[in-house]
Swiss-Prot record:
Belongs to the PetG family. The 4 large subunits of the cytochrome b6-f complex are cytochrome b6, subunit IV (17 kDa polypeptide, PetD), cytochrome f and the Rieske protein, while the 4 small subunits are PetG, PetL, PetM and PetN. The complex functions as a dimer. One of its GO terms (biological process) is cytochrome complex assembly. This is Cytochrome b6-f complex subunit 5.
Length: 37
């Protein structure tokens, strides 16, 4: 049980981190698009 908690936290953080970086990259892309007008 003690080892299941950290692995569960890591497995929970991986999708959150990847989704967050994807959203950040998308927002930066959109911002660059608007500046290029």
């Amino acid at each position: 049980m003690i080892e299941a908690l950290p692995s569960g936290i890591v497995l929970g953080l991986i999708p959150i981190t990847s989704a967050g970086s994807s959203v950040t990259a998308y927002l930066q892309y959109r911002r660059g698009d608007q500046l290029d007008i």
